Structure formats: C-alpha cells, structure tokens
Amino acid sequence: MTLTLADLYASPDHYLHSFDGDTAVFVPMDRAAYHRSIFLDARISPAEDGALRVPVAALIESIPASLPTGWIMHVAHCGSTLLARALDDADANLVLREPQALRQLAFGPPDGRLALTTAMLSKRYRPDLPTIVKGNVPTNFLLPRISAATPDAPMIFLYLPLREYLFAILRSDNHRTWLRNVTTQLGKHVGGAIGALHNASDAQRAAALWLAQMQLYADTAGIMVNARSLDAEMFFADPTTALTAAAAHFGVPLSPREIEARVGGALFATYSKNPAQSFGNADRLARRNDVEAELSVDLDEAERWIAARETEASSALATLRAIPLAV
C-alpha cells in the first residue's frame, strides 16, 4: 500500500522522528511502542525496524492545522519524565517524551518546520483524548514561536528554585558535562548573560541557564492563558495532588483510584529514566544532602551571580508563582 502525505499527517503510526538535512525521517510506531519509549530521540523503541525518508519541501506544501496539544516544559532533572510517564495511559492518550525533531528546531532557522513538527506531534489514536508533548531544555527556547502559534494550549512549566536546581545540575561530572554542552549549544540564548561563555564556570553556566529559562517561562505566561507552573519540590513532596492537578489541566481521564495506584506503585519507586533502578523521593533527598558540602563553593558563586540580577530573577519567579497548577 502506497502512503500519501495525508496518511503521514493522519496516523501516529508514522512518527516524525528527526530531520536529516532537507529530509524528514519517519519511523514506524504503534501505541505500545510510544508507551515503552521513555524518550523519542535516539533511545526510541519503534514498532519495527526501518525508516521512511520524505523531502521536507513536500511536507511543508500542505501542513494541516495542529490538533489541540498539551505541553510540559521543564528545566531538566526536575521530575519531568516521571510526571510525563505518570500521565501516559497505554490504552488512552498519547504522551510524547522529548521528540528529537522538536529539539533539532531549537538550533535551526524558522523555516516552516515548527508548524510541520507540531502538526505531526499532535496526532492521536483516540480523537477524544489529548496528546501531550514533553520538551527538553533546548525546546524551551522555542517557546516564543510555540506560544505565538498556539496561545490557548494548556502548558505546565515544571521548574526548581535556584538552590535545588543547582543541586540537580551540578551533582556529578556527567551532569556538569551535560551543562557545558547544552549551554555551549544554546550560547546565543545564554552566552550574552555571562560574557565569554568559554571562560564561564559551571556555577555561572548553571545560574545563567536557570535564569534564562525562568524568564522564558514568565514571558510565555503572559501570552498563553492556560499556562500553569509547578514547583518540582511540591511535585516530589505531594505527587498525588500534583498528578491530579496535571491530569485535570490536560484533560487526561485518570480517576483518583488510578492516580493512587500510580503514585503507590513501581513508577514512583524506580528511576523514571531507568525502571530497573530503585529510586524514590527519599533517595533523591539523601543524594542532595550527600553533595551539599561538596557543592558549597559552587552554590555560593551561582547565588552571587543571581543576586547581581535580583530584579530579573525575582520578577520571573513572582510571575510563575502567580499561576500555580491547582486542583
């Protein structure tokens, strides 16, 4: 059977995975494949092998309007994967975690691919239930374009207060490597705040990235009327309330019994990115305490950096705290 462009835009079985130059790469998926794919980047677990390559120019000629889509935007290492997986019902709505194509757009020109990508991501198996997209740090910098295109879409900004963010981002060599890489990649967005980025310390990079994201969220909140904020510490401390509110916000049909089962089950007792590893909130807090003394110099430096920009930081946080996710 020959696929048409209409088929590609209609069925989630044809997943726009990434762009390779002027070519869009589709991989075969089904509902089970989406559910088991914790991430939809290189770690995707497709329904079968193989890929379909289609010229981007052909797809852009006839982009349909995106269907209503919910968004989880986050600062990284803050429980976003846990929240997204908790909202994912294998028999109901789709939750797309960190689509590779969307991430790529954060580093490319505004050439029509965002409309193409959001239309492809908005597909669903059940028309009566929402599709939710969980972004990543680079996709935060698409927010001006996303908000302009879909100002009515429901969105959650999952964030951490500065000190908790620093604990999460600076706690290991691997996390610091990630921080250096992503801030270098996003240099045009965060480099101006700290001058010569290649000379910046890890603490300065972390502080600059945190502030840039807080300001993006605050600016977007003024455009997207259905945007709400969620302090990740509140999510970790009371996941039942947070998950109940998130499900209601996105229109995900989770009953109180289903929510209690998820919060009390394996999902919240294992590492969200690796279900084979036991990990809960108590482990997270213990890890935080273990690194507090080790990070004291970095914490002080980052907090001084933010203190010099207190007006911007306080304004952004005040805006977010004025739109809390609530049941």
Name each model feature, range by range.
Residues A86-A90, R145-I156, A247-H249:
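Short, surface-exposed basic-aromatic patches at helix termini and helix-loop junctions that form
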Residues T220-E294:
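The conserved 3'-phosphoadenosine-5'-phosphosulfate
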Residues V95, M155, A227-S229:
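Conserved beta-strand scaffold positions in the cores of enzyme catalytic domains, especially
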